[in-house]
Design a protein with these regions (language model features):
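Electropositive polyanion-binding surfaces
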Residues: 230, 257-260, 264, 271-705, ...
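Charge-lined substrate channels and their catalytic hotspots, especially those that engage the 3′ end
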Residues: 1-326, 333-379, 417, 714-716, ...
C-alpha cells in the first residue's frame, strides 16, 4: 500500500478525533464530510481507519460507525466488510441517489397519505409534524426525519394501518422550505473545527463549523451560526458563525442569546433613530389645534416604580351619583406617521419585550420615555376616552376626543396601595389632596369588577414572578408578585376604556383591529370536567359549548381547595390564545361582546394603529380622503403580524424567566423546600415552590414503587403500595439539578420519616 508522507500524521489526527469528548461514532462518509475531504483524501481515510482497526486502536460497529477502541477488539475481516459497505456508489446515479432524501425512493402514495406541515423537533432526535386543520400532530420516528429540522415545512407520508387511540406515524419525504436559516447556541471547539450546540432543545443536530468559518469564536462562546448545508439523515449539518455574542459567563450574554434565538430586533436602524431625533421634545403650539384642553383637570399616572414609558393617565370625579372617568392615552400617532421608518420598525417589532434584565422597546427611548410618556408636570398630547358611569358600572355616555393634559402626580402602585390600606403615613401626608380621588377609584373599580363578574368574566389571579438580579446580571432572588388594589384599579379602568372604544367602532362598522378570544377546545374542557368530577366537583354545561360563566363557576367551586391554584392553571390551559383580528367576534375570557387594545400605544402596535383610525374619523378623513379603503387593505396584515410578534415576545419572556429561575436554583443545590404538586404526567411530578419556581421529580427517582399515570384522575399511583401523588398535594423536595442551558430544575422527593 502506497502511503503519502503525511500518513502517520493523519493517523494521529484521526485518533485524536475519535478520542475527542465531543466525538460521536460516525460512518466513513460522515467523517470524510466532517473533515471536508476530496476523493483522494477519502481513499486515504479508508486506509487510515483500516490500519487503526487492525492495530486494535479503533473499532467499527455493525452499522459501520467508528470509535476509539473500548476494550473489545473487532475482527479485522468484519471491519473491512463494513468499510466496503460504506464505499459510496460511483457515477451520476450514485450521486443523485445520495442527494435524494432517503425516504423519497422507499415510500410511495400507496403506502399512506401525503400531507404537508411544520416539523417540530425533539432533543432525542424524533419529531412531530403539525398539519393545519388536523388536531393531533403526526409522530416522526428518529430514523424517518430525513434532513428535516425544527420549524421546516415538510412533505410527509402518513403510514397506513393507524390504530385507534394511538398517534399517527409518518415519514419525511421532502423538505419544502427551511424554517431556521440560523441558530443560536454554544460553540465547542476542537483542534481544527468545532460545533455549535443549539440553545433550542428542539434542534437536536449539532452544526459542524470549520476553523475558517468560526469567526475566531472561543470554546464556550454564545454565537449565531448560519446553516450553509442542512446535511442529511447520516450527515451533520454545516454552518458558519456570523456573530459572536460573548462568553457564556459574561453578564447579559445569556439573555442576549434568547433575544437572538427569537429573532427579536434589538437595535434600531440609523434611519429610525435619525427620524426620532427630529421629533421635538416638547408640545408645539400648532399641535394643540382642534384639541380639547384638559390641562386643568386633575390627572395622575399609576405605574410600577421603575416604569419610564407612562402611556396612560386617569382622572375621576363623582357628581349626582355619576362617575366621570377619564382614561387619557399618550397620542403616539401624532409623532409616528403611518408608513414612516419609525412606523415600519414599530410594526416589525409589534410590541415591547420585557425580559429579566432588559426591556426591548417598540419605539426608540427618545419617544417612549420622552415626548410620548405622560410625565408629571409636562404638557402631553393624548387621546381620551371620557366616560360617564352609573352606580351599577354601566357606561351611560362617552366621548372619544383628541386632548392635551398635564399630569399632576406620577404615582406608583405601592404608594396607592399603602394609602388605600392605611399603612403609610408618609405617603398619606404627601398625597393628601389626592386621597379622596384614590378612594373614589377604589369604589368604582369594585363596581366594575362586580359587573364583569356578573356577566361571567373569568379572573385568573395567579402570582407572577419577580426575579431580582445583581449588578452582574445573576439571579439572586425569585419572589411571587401578586396583584393588589392599585394594579386592579388600573386594570379595571383600562378594560372599560378598551370595551367602550371597541363598541363604538364595531357598531359604526369602521375598519378596525379588535382583540378577540375564541371559545375553549371542547376536548380539553371534557378532560377538565372529568378531573373535576374525580375531585367531587360536578359542573353541568348548559349547551354544546361551555360558557364564560360556567368557567367562572369552576373557579368558584374549587376556591379554598388545596389544589385550587393548580386546577385554575389547568383551566387556563383549556383556553385558546387571544389574538388580533379585523372581525369583532368577542372575547370569551372577558365575556365581552366588544374588545380592543386602545390603552398602550407606546408598547403595542395595534393600539397605535387604531389611534390613527380614530384620528382619521374624528377629523373626517376616513371618507373624505379615502382612508377607509386604505385601512381595509392593510389591517388584516397588521393584525396577523401583531399576533405573531406578541406570541414571539411571550415565548421569549417565558424563556428568560425559566433561564433565570434555573440559574437561581443552581446556587441552592441540595437545599430542601416545601412545595405543591402543580402537574402530574407519565414521566414525573411537577412541583411548584412558594417563590413560583417549578421543577420536575422524574418518575425514575421514585424508587419505592412502580408508579402508573392515571390520566383521567390526573395522578400517579404506586402499583404495589397504592401510594398516590395528586395535583395540589404538599411534598418536600430537594434540589437535585438546575440546568441553565436547558432552563430546567430537577427535584427529588424527600421521604417522610
Amino acid at each position: 500500500m502506497k502511503r503519502s508522507k503525511n500518513f502517520e500524521k493523519r493517523k494521529k489526527f484521526i485518533m485524536e478525533l475519535l478520542g475527542d469528548p465531543l466525538y460521536k461514532p460516525m460512518r466513513l462518509r460522515e467523517i470524510a464530510s466532517l473533515l471536508q475531504l476530496d476523493k483522494s483524501e477519502k481513499k486515504e481515510l479508508f486506509d487510515v481507519l483500516d490500519e487503526l482497526c487492525a492495530q486494535g486502536k479503533a473499532e467499527v460497529d455493525n452499522k459501520g460507525r467508528y470509535s476509539k477502541v473500548s476494550g473489545k477488539r473487532r475482527d479485522r475481516r468484519k471491519n473491512k466488510e463494513a468499510l466496503k459497505a460504506e464505499k459510496p456508489e460511483r457515477g451520476r446515479k450514485g450521486r443523485e441517489r445520495r442527494e435524494k432524501n432517503h425516504e423519497e425512493y422507499r415510500f410511495s402514495e400507496k403506502d399512506g397519505t401525503l400531507m404537508e406541515g411544520t416539523f417540530i423537533g425533539h432533543y432525542k432526535g424524533f419529531g412531530f409534524v403539525e398539519v393545519e386543520g388536523q388536531e393531533q400532530d403526526i409522530f416522526i420516528p428518529e430514523n424517518d426525519t430525513g434532513s428535516a429540522m425544527h420549524q421546516d415545512k415538510v412533505q410527509i407520508l402518513v403510514r397506513n394501518g393507524h390504530k385507534e387511540g394511538k398517534r399517527q406515524e409518518g415519514v419525511v419525504l421532502k423538505v419544502l422550505e427551511r424554517g431556521m436559516p440560523s441558530i443560536v447556541g454554544t460553540y465547542q471547539s476542537s483542534r481544527d473545527y468545532g460545533f455549535v450546540i443549539s440553545d433550542n432543545p428542539k434542534f437536536s443536530k449539532d452544526i459542524f463549523i470549520s476553523r475558517k468559518n468560526s469567526m475566531g469564536a472561543k470554546d464556550g462562546d454564545k454565537v449565531v451560526a448560519e446553516i450553509t448545508d442542512y446535511g442529511s439523515r447520516n450527515r451533520k449539518p454545516e454552518g458558519k458563525i456570523t456573530e459572536v455574542l460573548g462568553n457564556l459567563r459574561s453578564p447579559g450574554t445569556d439573555i442576549l442569546a434568547i433575544v437572538k434565538s427569537f429573532n427579536i430586533p434589538s437595535v434600531f436602524p440609523d434611519k429610525v433613530l435619525r427620524q426620532a431625533d427630529r421629533v421635538s421634545d416638547h408640545v408645539q403650539e400648532a399641535d394643540l389645534d382642534g384639541r380639547l384642553d384638559l390641562r386643568n383637570l386633575v390627572t395622575v399616572t399609576i405605574d410600577g416604580e421603575d416604569a419610564k414609558d407612562l402611556d396612560d393617565a386617569i382622572s375621576l370625579t363623582k357628581e349626582d351619583g355619576i362617575y366621570h372617568l377619564g382614561v387619557h392615552i399618550a397620542d403616539v400617532s401624532n409623532y409616528v406617521q403611518g408608513g414612516s421608518a419609525l412606523d415600519r420598525e414599530a410594526l416589525k417589532r409589534g410590541t415591547s419585550v420585557y425580559l429579566a434584565d432588559r426591556v426591548i422597546p417598540m419605539l426608540p427611548e427618545r419617544l417612549s420615555n420622552g415626548i410620548c410618556s405622560l410625565n408629571q408636570g409636562q404638557d402631553r398630547l393624548t387621546l381620551s376616552c371620557l366616560m360617564d358611569v352609573n352606580e351599577k358600572g354601566k357606561v351611560i355616555s362617552h366621548k372619544i376626543a383628541e386632548t392635551v393634559i398635564r399630569v399632576d402626580e406620577r404615582m406608583c402602585y405601592t404608594d396607592v396601595k399603602n394609602i388605600l390600606e392605611d399603612t403609610d403615613e408618609v405617603a398619606k401626608k404627601r398625597y393628601e389632596a389626592l386621597i379622596p380621588m384614590f378612594f373614589l377609584m377604589k369604589e368604582l373599580s369594585g363596581i366594575l369588577r362586580s359587573r364583569r363578574h356578573t356577566r361571567g368574566s373569568i379572573d385568573f389571579d395567579f402570582p407572577e414572578s419577580k426575579i431580582i438580579l445583581n449588578a452582574a446580571g445573576r439571579a439572586i432572588d425569585v419572589q411571587p408578585y401578586e396583584a393588589n388594589v392599585a394594579t386592579r384599579i388600573i386594570e379595571d379602568f383600562m378594560l372599560l376604556a378598551n370595551e367602550t372604544v371597541a363598541q363604538e367602532y364595531c357598531t359604526g362598522d369602521y375598519p378596525f383591529v379588535y382583540r378577540t378570544h375564541e371559545n375553549p377546545d371542547p376536548e380539553k374542557i371534557e378532560s377538565l370536567l372529568m378531573l373535576l368530577h374525580n375531585e367531587g366537583v360536578n359542573i353541568q354545561k348548559s349547551g354544546q359549548e361551555i360558557t364564560p360563566g360556567e368557567i367562572q363557576e369552576i373557579l368558584e367551586s374549587i376556591e379554598g381547595m388545596p389544589n385550587e391554584a393548580q386546577i385554575s392553571r389547568l383551566t387556563l390551559r383549556t383556553m385558546k390564545q387571544a389574538k388580533y383580528t379585523t372581525e369583532c367576534s368577542g372575547h370569551f375570557g372577558l365575556a365581552a361582546k366588544y374588545y380592543c387594545h386602545f390603552t398602550s400605544p407606546i408598547r403595542r402596535y395595534p393600539d397605535l394603529q387604531i389611534h390613527r383610525i380614530i384620528h382619521d374619523r374624528l377629523r373626517g378623513r376616513l371618507v373624505r380622503e379615502g382612508r377607509t379603503e386604505h385601512y381595509k387593505e392593510i389591517l388584516d396584515e397588521v393584525a396577523r403580524q401583531s399576533s405573531v410578534c406578541e406570541r414571539r415576545a411571550d415565548e421569549a419572556e417565558r424563556e428568560s424567566d425559566k433561564l433565570k429561575k434555573a440559574e437561581y436554583m443552581s446556587y441552592h443545590l441540595g437545599e430542601e423546600y416545601e412545595g405543591i404538586i402543580s402537574g402530574v404526567t407519565g414521566w414525573g411530578l411537577y412541583v411548584e415552590l412558594p417563590n413560583t419556581v417549578e421543577g420536575l421529580i422524574h418518575i425514575n427517582t421514585l424508587r419505592d414503587d412502580y408508579y402508573v399515570f392515571d390520566q383521567d384522575a390526573y395522578e400517579l399511583r404506586g402499583d404495589i403500595t397504592g401510594k398516590i401523588f395528586r395535583l395540589g398535594q404538599k411534598v418536600r423536595v430537594r434540589v437535585a439539578d438546575a440546568d441553565k442551558m436547558l432552563k430546567t430544575v430537577d427535584f427529588v422527593l424527600v421521604e417522610e420519616d
